[in-house]
Amino acid sequence: MEGGGKPNSSSNSRDDGNSVFPAKAPATGAGPAAAEKRLGTPPGGGGAGAKEHGNSVCFKVDGGGGGGEESAGGLEDAEGPRRQYGFMQRQFTSMLQPGVNKFSLRMFGSQKAVEKEQERVKTAGFWIIHSYSDFRFYWDLIMLIMMVGNLVIIPVGITFFTEQTTTPWIIFNVASDTVFLLDLIMNFRTGTVNEDSSEIILDPKVIKMNYLKSWFVVDFISSIPVDYIFLIVEKGMDSEVYKTARALRIVRFTKILSLLRLLRLSRLIRYIHQWEEIFHMTYDLASAVVRIFNLIGMMLLLCHWDGCLQFLVPLLQDFPPDCWVSLNEMVNDSWGKQYSYALFKAMSHMLCIGYGAQAPVSMSDLWITMLSMIVGATCYAMFVGHATALIQSLDSSRRQYQEKYKQVEQYMSFHKLPADMRQKIHDYYEHRYQGKIFDEENILNELNDPLREEIVNFNCRKLVATMPLFANADPNFVTAMLSKLRFEVFQPGDYIIREGAVGKKMYFIQHGVAGVITKSSKEMKLTDGSYFGEICLLTKGRRTASVRADTYCRLYSLSVDNFNEVLEEYPMMRRAFETVAIDRLDRIGKKNSILLQKFQKDLNTGVFNNQENEILKQIVKHDREMVQAIAPISYPQMTALNSTSSTATPTSRMRTQSPPVYTATSLSHSNLHSPSPSTQTPQPSAILSPCSYTTAVCSPPVQSPLATRTFHYASPTASQLSLMPQQQQQPQAPQTQPQQPPQQPQTPGSATPKNEVHRSTQALPNTSLTREVRPLSASQPSLPHEVSTLISRPHPTVGESLASIPQPVAAVHSAGLQAAGRSTVPQRVTLFRQMSSGAIPPNRGVPPAPPPPAAPLQREASSVLNTDPEAEKPRFASNL
């Protein structure tokens, strides 16, 4: 070359099209321009390097040291196609292996097991296809489409079309035969499932032997390219050969019918089920839809085959005069009309409703009709059986409910229950089970702990959201509490709890309205989110009120054992329950020595820390806010009650002395045992008054507490049970008025109105009590000074009025109870009223007045009506 050295003979050029162009020396006399033109160098480039645009290779046509760079460039370009080929090979190989997806994870158990299965496919041999691979999935989908097309189109083409050489028909047959031949080859390289061990067989020799023994003969015969042979020999054959070809096509149709394999259909159903899970479809609904479509499709396909067979048999006989086609003069009609009549005849036979347009006359039609009836009866029985099982599986819980209620109806008929009771039982089952029965406890027990807790929290999410106690509690405590709940339903008028019964459960209202019935005329309503009955669980006492369902109530109950089991693990929540219970009792002027002793013990041991103190403050604050929300509503009624006359009975004329107010800093441990100087004088009664102790430590006695107290609803949406006393019959202003002696007879007309003063406040007759003395409730052991008179409202379980011991006075009436009879009640000391969270100080504006010598101390009127803003401040949390 002129002006340059020889080109590097070892360097070759290779573009991205995987073509290699060796650099050849130019011919003699060609000149450098020709060589540069062949190499793609622009003219006039001289000794400059030539470079093609795009992905071409750079060349150095200069002599000297450019040979090494040219060689390196050629090797790099050669690696590109190799990497591309390796990438394609890896992608195709991965399609032959099972992928890591939801279906494979469910089949093999874990991702590691799937990876192990992938390694088995790699080591099994070349072109071994896993039965759960993506490639096999898409291939089976193509085969399904081809099978449906063949099973529908080929019978119609063979039966109703004489010309088999049209272009669409040839294309369809060629394509289907090619696909079936490829499927025949792939079946030798596809792993099979071992039915005994459910393991995928990947050994080529075992796969080949299993396929040869099972479906190979049927697939090979049905995959013979009859259409190809027919196209080759068609021109050299006469009409007789054409008839032979038609007979071969019939054989082809028979072979195609054998291609419908249950294994492929079942595998397809599994894939469809996998898609349904991916799209978050319901399992029952999805499986039911698939089964319905499979059943309907099978019935329609059998009717289609039978219709083609009805016309094919006369066709093979060249339409004899006694066949149904000739009798109906349909030999030369269009194929659509012929197919319609044939299908109608087939469906009439299969459904056993007739013989179609024409009754069978010839022997061949007779046998075809009997065959159709047998097949139709079998299919009809299968259809009815599958449909029945399908309907039952769609809603098994409703079916169980119907079976259960039939047993209930038989039970009611056997015992001859009245109609109203039967209606109540029917309504209970409707509201309790709502038409479905399932063993929820068994279902939850079969789940693991995280899933079970998640379900319980979801089911009770609205209940938790409406309860302040749960809002400030530990989430683990809430979960443990909810997992112990038991669902119950009560009808309107049902007593959920009864007064005087031993408390074994507490209740949480999910939906409904319940009323708290006390011995007074006032009632409290409980709605969604409220709970009640926890005080008896804490004190192991008896119910002090009855709760009756006003509407259908859906409740969650918690037994005392489960309650204590949960609170043992969360002592702070037990103290929270006890704090709320003390606060509630104190707001109605009652106390419980068990709760007070526990609280005093915890206070002395110093278990209350700052964090727990803040939590208890919030809980008590929520409970008090609900009481304050209902207090303005009840204030006018209670004011009217306060303004009425109180001269109905001697006990109602007793005044209440306002005890002095003590601050929290003035209380100490020594105050618990230091008696007040003004109360050290013994009382004439055999029972010493608990108010012989300081008023900062104990509360003054209350006259007829059970007859003058009632429950009040805390808030229209409250979740707490608030207890509020009614106002006493006399206002606080005339407290300094001297008390009349109890022996003064009752003045006619001076009694309070019937709707304001309870009937139990009337004077006792001179005779003895109507019933024996009822023991004090175990849930209120700290109230020996609180006595009850006759109660107008009877106990729910007793049809008579109850009697209790009246308050002892200095001068006992000659016909009243003797002091010796009252001395059997043990003396009890009320502990530390100031420490209770609900202790609201009395009105400081009224100075205390000394009581008459013959009259015991009285508790002042309900502190709920106290309008002093300082008195309404909660003092419990500050004492913690």
Swiss-Prot record:
SMART domains xref list = cNMP
Q: Which residues lie on this side of the membrane: Extracellular?
A: 159-167, 231-254, 313-338, 361-365
Please name the InterPro entries in this protein's record: cNMP-bd_CS (IPR018488), cNMP-bd_dom (IPR000595), cNMP-bd_dom_sf (IPR018490), Ion_trans_dom (IPR005821), Ion_trans_N (IPR013621), K/Na_HCN_channel (IPR051413), K_chnl_volt-dep_EAG/ELK/ERG (IPR003938), RmlC-like_jellyroll (IPR014710)
Question: Basic and acidic residues compositional bias: what residue ranges?
Answer: 870-880
Task: Say which domain of life the source belongs to.
Answer: Eukaryota
Q: Where is the composition biased (Low complexity)?
A: 8-34, 665-685, 725-738
Its keywords, alphabetically, are: cAMP, cAMP-binding, Cell membrane, Glycoprotein, Ion channel, Ion transport, Ligand-gated ion channel, Membrane, Nucleotide-binding, Potassium, Potassium channel, Potassium transport, Sodium, Sodium channel, Sodium transport, Transmembrane, Transmembrane helix, Transport, Voltage-gated channel
Q: Where is the composition biased (Gly residues)?
A: 62-71
Matching PROSITE patterns, A to Z?
CNMP_BINDING_1, CNMP_BINDING_3
Bilayer topology reads: Multi-pass membrane protein
Reaction catalysed by this enzyme: Na(+)(in) = Na(+)(out); K(+)(in) = K(+)(out)
Q: Alphabetically, which GO biological process terms does the record hold?
A: apical protein localization; cellular response to cAMP; general adaptation syndrome, behavioral process; neuronal action potential; potassium ion transmembrane transport; protein homotetramerization; regulation of membrane depolarization; retinal cone cell development
Compositional bias ranges of the Polar residues kind: 641-664, 760-770
Residues binding 3',5'-cyclic AMP are 533-534, 536, 543-544, 584, 587
TM segment ranges:
137-158, 168-188, 210-230, 255-275, 290-312, 366-386
Where is composition skewed (Pro residues) in this entry? 844-855
Q: How is the enzymatic or functional activity of this protein modulated?
A: Activated by cAMP. cAMP binding promotes tetramerization and formation of an active channel. Compared to other family members, cAMP has less stimulatory effect on HCN1 because part of the molecules already contain bound cAMP and form homotetramers when cAMP levels are low, this inherent tetramerization in HCN1 results in a weaker response to increased cAMP.
Motif (Selectivity filter) on chain: 352-356
Q: Where in the cell is it found?
A: Cell membrane
Q: Which GO terms describe its cellular component?
A: axon; dendrite; glutamatergic synapse; HCN channel complex; plasma membrane; postsynaptic membrane; presynaptic active zone membrane
Molecular function per GO: cAMP binding; identical protein binding; intracellular cAMP-activated cation channel activity involved in regulation of presynaptic membrane potential; intracellularly cAMP-activated cation channel activity; voltage-gated monoatomic cation channel activity; voltage-gated potassium channel activity; voltage-gated sodium channel activity
User: Any domain commentary?
Assistant: The segment S4 is probably the voltage-sensor and is characterized by a series of positively charged amino acids at every third position.
Function per UniProt = Hyperpolarization-activated ion channel that are permeable to sodium and potassium ions. Exhibits weak selectivity for potassium over sodium ions. Contributes to the native pacemaker currents in heart (If) and in neurons (Ih). Participates in cerebellar mechanisms of motor learning. May mediate responses to sour stimuli.
Quaternary data: Homotetramer. Heterotetramer with HCN2. The potassium channel is composed of a homo- or heterotetrameric complex of pore-forming subunits. Interacts with KCNE2. Interacts with the SH3 domain of CSK.
Please report which protein family the annotation says this sequence is part of: Belongs to the potassium channel HCN family.
Q: What is this protein called?
A: Potassium/sodium hyperpolarization-activated cyclic nucleotide-gated channel 1
Which species expresses this protein natively? Oryctolagus cuniculus
